[in-house]
Amino acid sequence: MVIGVGNRWRGDDGAGLAVARRVRELAPAWVEVRELEGDATALVEAWSGAEHAVVVDAAESGAPPGTVRRFDAAAGRLPVHSLRSSTHAFGVADAVELARALGRLPGRLDVYAIEGASFTAGGSLSPEVERAVDDLATALTHP
């Protein structure tokens, strides 16, 4: 299962959604792909029953734009500073910890953060993030 999180109307904050759309194009039909905009608490329900879930969101940590980082969320707490949550009322890291407390984490949960360059309203994905989206979607569908 691949879940893209973000806001398509705020520039690079749409990176997770773009990865989900690209994975949907590349992956076999049996791969479940979801796009979530808004409050990340919906993640807890979205990955319910999944043995392995991949979540992709934008990051704003000061790394170079287009940098992709992977976190093993089932193994421990996510570094909150590495994930963007300002356009989500409740961020991915918060949703992971809520699911952990409720005993509702998938057996394996990989969270990918794509470093953005611009999160302005009405903007599109930056070239660096577009490349990262394509590279990550390809890596996820052709391991």
Features from the language model and the residues they span:
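N-terminal catalytic or cofactor-binding beta/alpha core of small enzyme domains
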Residues: M1-S118, G123-D134, A139-P143
